[in-house]
Design a protein with these regions (language model features):
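Short beta->alpha junction loops
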Residues: 7, 53-65, 294-297, 325
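Short, aromatic/basic amphipathic alpha-helical patches
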Residues: 18-20, 38-48, 95, 330-340
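A broadly used, surface-exposed interaction patch
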Residues: 26-85, 91-104
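Mixed-charge intrinsically disordered linker/loop segments at interdomain junctions
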Residues: 92-162
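Intrinsically disordered, low-complexity Ser/Thr/Pro/Gly-rich regulatory segments
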Residues: 136-372
């Protein structure tokens, strides 16, 4: 029987990933009062064939840790491996004492998907990766709904590109329509009239989701697409274009990454309401990258929201990106830097036209930074 002895610490991903990578028959969780709830998050994700036991120790008592590990060795037979990626230094020292005494194996998992074998200090890449749903579950959160970006409809992408061109060619008309939607419709499509004629000759028509915009009877934007109003008025056109570029980048990787769009989370088990928390979610192997897409004005509250979402659903090792269609004020750029939020935004309004196509290059840069 293969046994894996796991020293639990505050971070849970390396613990679960070590189990997934090696597939032991029995897992021995060595935890403290502060970490004794972590196995409850891990166990539902494990195959039913994997057995487990839980042991309690003090975080700074190396002797007790050594005694527990020796008890495990004496009461069981088979192969023993220790995951020493987490826990306090004294817990690790207590475990290492038993590793040496019984000539067991021990390993450490690094943030860049490497296994360090502690007996030889040799490194090798892990063979498994963590999926989005696993990382979210391990953070103690619950997915309600998401759309896989690999299933993005070409019609949505084309319509979003047309909306972008309309905004760049007719900024005043776009501002007028968005102001009407914000003030008179309270940013809810349910309140959007079937048509509206403005005093300057600007007019729109919408039916069953399609959208047509005219100026003095000259067509400015024609979208017979059933999702057009949703894309234009709610700003989802920018989210769609960003998600498409992230998808393009992912498909070029040797191991394509998961890309989700419009991710809904359930706040907790008692509260069944859902909230659209994440525009685009990228699984950069062991880390989640949360991408907030802003097609309009960006406030300081938006930046705080991005930071809070990252902390709630991804933890310390995740990253956040603010992808803005418009340039960002200097004070907001500084705030992003202070909170370690990557910023994807044009420096000037003129750069907006082709700026979206530079996102894959930035993802190359950020992806490398994530594993340092």
């Amino acid at each position: 029987m293969n046994h894996q002895i796991v020293i639990l610490g505050k971070e849970i991903l390396s613990v679960y990933h070590g189990i997934k990578e090696f597939g032991p028959d029995m897992v021995h969780f060595v935890c403290t009062e502060e970490t004794n709830q972590l196995p409850d998050r891990i166990l539902p994700l494990l195959p039913s064939s994997i057995q487990h036991k839980i042991y309690h120790v003090q975080p700074y008592d190396a002797r007790t840790v050594a005694q527990v590990c020796e008890q495990i060795q004496k009461e069981n037979e088979g192969f023993f491996a220790y995951n020493l990626s987490e826990g306090t230094k004294l817990m690790t020292l207590g475990a290492i004492y038993i590793v040496r005494k019984y000539q067991a194996k021990a390993f450490y998992l690094t943030p860049n998907r490497e296994i360090v074998h502690l007996d030889t200090l040799e490194k090798e890449l892990m063979h498994t990766t963590l999926e989005n749903h696993e990382i979210v579950s391990l953070s103690g959160n619950h997915l309600a709904e998401y759309h896989n970006a690999k299933d993005l409809a070409e019609a949505d992408i084309d319509a979003s590109a047309s909306i972008k061109n309309f905004i760049e060619q007719h900024p005043k008309e776009h501002a007028r329509l968005q102001k009407f939607f914000g003030i008179f419709c309270r940013r809810d499509l349910i309140n959007l009239p079937a048509s509206k004629l403005f005093q300057d000759g600007l007019r729109y028509k919408q039916r069953d989701g399609s959208l047509f915009i005219y100026k003095e009877n000259q067509p400015l934007l024609s979208l017979p697409h059933t999702n057009a109003c949703h894309l234009y008025f709610e700003g989802r056109w920018w989210e769609t274009l960003v998600a498409n570029q992230v998808r393009i980048w992912s498909n070029k990787q040797s191991s394509p990454r998961e890309v989700w769009q419009s991710v809904l989370f359930q706040s907790n088990k008692q509260d069944t309401r859902t909230k659209n928390e994440v525009d685009v979610l990228l699984n950069n192997e062991l880390k989640l990258m949360f991408i907030e897409c802003k097609s309009g004005y960006v406030s300081q509250n938006d930046i705080y929201k991005i930071d809070a979402v990252r902390e709630t659903y991804g933890g310390d090792i995740s990253q956040a990106v603010l992808a803005s269609y418009y340039p960002i004020a200097k004070d907001l750029q500084d705030k992003c830097a202070d909170l370690q939020i990557y910023l994807f935004a044009p420096k000037t309004a003129d750069q907006r036209i082709d700026f979206i196509y530079t996102l894959p290059d930035r993802l190359d840069e950020w992806s490398g930074a994530l594993i340092l």
